[in-house]
């Protein structure tokens, strides 16, 4: 059974560890993430971008697939199915489709419009038992067509959005989606501390977790970050393992072309990467 993300993130905040959000793109991805989290006894948030939802033929398909897999795989750890960087329309669709959590990315609106839309979605989500994440200060880079400039969030705006009753907050602190450039200045911990103090101890979210040094992740967790999003890193190891399989000619040996065999090394690479992140975030055994 899917759960919303509120309880697992409050426990993470109070226990000073991070819950991973691993984005999923298909059945293999979902199976790999669930396998890793069950083996490590870690709670998990399965992130689905609107682009990934469309790729998997729609939010209803995703919700049905994930719910069935959690059941048929005998998963015992808490699993939330979460819309990542949702539009206003996407959030409403996921509430109806059977997701257990949503993120409304209103960071590109004026603060007034962001407040108005967030307020409405908080009421809709909570009425159906979903948790809701909101964003202030856009996250840099590109996430499935959503382009962010990498702003530092204003603590006052963060406080305004938090007061609307959201369950966790994504605040830009210099983090970006994708691979970090060589001249990246790092996370702004002073900004994170100000945001944490201004938002009444709400669980904070760190987007763009790929490529952030381990010591920065640990410091972010100590300053109130309870959820860390990983996507690009899993994509990179999946691509690398699949490429190696083909370059070694294994797809031409026997029935090596069978997609179940062809995709197996990539799927295992995702399992291994997820386990590595679970150890880093300190959430092994917390499920």
Regions picked out by a protein language model, each given a short descriptive name:
Residues 246-287:
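Extended, intrinsically disordered, low-complexity segments
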Residues 173, 208-210, 232:
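Active-site proximal loops enriched in glycine and acidic residues that flank catalytic Cys/His/Asp
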Residues 4-20, 253-260:
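Generic N-terminal amphipathic, Lys/Arg-enriched alpha-helix
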Residues 17-25, 50-54, 261, 265:
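A short N-terminal beta->alpha junction/helix N-cap motif
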Residues 19-23, 81-82, 103, 204-207, ...:
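Short catalytic-loop micro-motif centered on adjacent basic/acidic residues
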Residues 3-15, 27-52, 57-76, 85-202, ...:
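Alpha/beta enzyme core
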């Amino acid at each position: 059974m899917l759960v919303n993300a509120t309880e697992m993130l409050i426990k993470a905040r109070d226990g000073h560890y991070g819950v991973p959000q691993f984005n999923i793109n298909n059945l293999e991805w979902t199976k790999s993430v669930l396998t890793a989290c069950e083996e490590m006894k870690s709670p998990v948030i399965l992130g689905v971008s609107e682009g990934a939802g469309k790729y998997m033929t729609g939010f209803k398909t995703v919700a049905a697939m994930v719910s069935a897999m959690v059941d048929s795989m005998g998963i015992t750890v808490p699993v939330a199915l979460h819309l990542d960087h949702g539009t206003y329309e996407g959030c409403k669709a996921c509430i109806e489709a059977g997701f257990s959590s949503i993120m409304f990315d209103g960071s590109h609106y004026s603060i007034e419009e962001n407040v108005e839309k967030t307020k409405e979605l908080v009421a809709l989500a909570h009425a159906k038992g979903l948790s809701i994440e909101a964003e202030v200060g856009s996250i840099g880079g590109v996430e499935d067509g959503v382009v962010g400039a990498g702003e530092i969030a204003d603590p006052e705006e963060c406080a305004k959005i938090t007061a609307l009753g959201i369950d966790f907050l994504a605040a830009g602190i210099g983090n970006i989606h994708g691979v970090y450039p060589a001249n990246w200045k790092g996370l702004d911990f002073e900004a994170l501390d100000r945001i944490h103090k201004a938002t009444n101890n709400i669980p904070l979210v760190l987007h763009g977790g790929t490529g952030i040094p381990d010591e920065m992740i640990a410091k972010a967790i100590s300053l109130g970050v309870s959820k860390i999003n990983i996507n690009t890193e899993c994509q990179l190891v999946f691509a690398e393992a699949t490429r190696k399989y083909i370059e070694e000619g294994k797809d031409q040996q026997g029935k090596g072309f069978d997609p179940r065999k062809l995709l197996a090394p990539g799927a295992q690479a995702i399992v291994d990467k997820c386990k590595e992140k679970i150890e880093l975030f300190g959430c092994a055994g917390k499920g």
